[in-house]
């Protein structure tokens, strides 16, 4: 009787890497949605809210471009975009954020402006949801 062993470690490692990327992407997408749906998010035209996106390290942002839901005054709807890739080793982390210049005032507060911590809450108040996304990604690898 003979026994043959097959080394499938490369396949397993690739599946685990893909699962990690899928988990980070799912967390980013969900965190983006959680931030945009936060009832504390102050909305005038929707420009800042619509700018919220996620990016997995080493990859482009989940949102390429965005625009306000409505114009302000006689001006056209504001538009913005993201280009480039998130810094860091591929699949090292996922981040959510905005490139709108006044978003730090929304997040952290500013002169005569209350802090809303939209991004912080999206990242920290849904940990059970994010754990489930990781579990699902690895179980489906």
Predicted regions and their residues:
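Short, Lys/Arg-rich flexible segments
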Residues: 1-141
